[in-house]
Amino acid sequence: MEEWKQYNIGEICDTISETYKGNASDVVLINTSDVLEGKCLNHTFVANKNLRGQFKKQFKKNDILYSEIRPANKRYAFIDFESTDYIASTKLMVIRSNDKVLPKYLYYVLQSKEMVEVLQMLAESRSGTFPQITFSELAIQTILLPEIREQSKIVDFLESIDSKIALNRRINDNLEQQAQALFKSWFV
């Protein structure tokens, strides 16, 4: 096993500011409130006309959307779908990995408790109306990075855990619905 190497985050990814130039009649607008703890919550198409000025950024599959505002609110998402007609708010960083890091590995690093705490502390240290970070501040954070093969093993392991957590949530939701149905049948 090779030794892990230290990198600044800016050495393994870029912030993407590609303006959406598509001409689809309908698009999906993604704001900071539409991403949470890894998921993109909004997939509702709206008419592509008179769009508010904040919706400009194009993104694609395997990109990471990360809110510039209040990192501790966990407003980030890994894009695991084709996003041709999706447009992100300018308050979301679009982060794209390079060939040194797997996109999902980078996502796991950026959403880790330790990284979120560091970014929140940086955000709170800035003057302004609300805690905010920039890609420049993110880019100088250092991480230890294994070789790609090891990253793949780590991602597989973490995805397995995430799948089990998601399954448990679905089971809990189902049990809650069953309990409510029983309660209604007994007491209503």
What is the predicted role of each segment?
Residues T32, S97, I143:
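Active-site donor-binding loop signature of nucleotide-sugar glycosyltransferases
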Residues I9, K39, A88, L102, ...:
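N-terminal alpha-helical segment
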Residues F55-M115, T134:
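A short beta-sheet element
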Residues Q6-I64, I79:
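Sequence-specific dsDNA recognition surfaces
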Residues F78-I79, E124-R126:
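Short amphipathic beta-strand starts and helix->beta connectors
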Residues Y86-L92, R126-V155:
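A short glycine-rich beta-alpha junction/loop motif
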Residues M1-Y20, L144-V188:
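Non-catalytic DNA-recognition/assembly elements of restriction-modification systems
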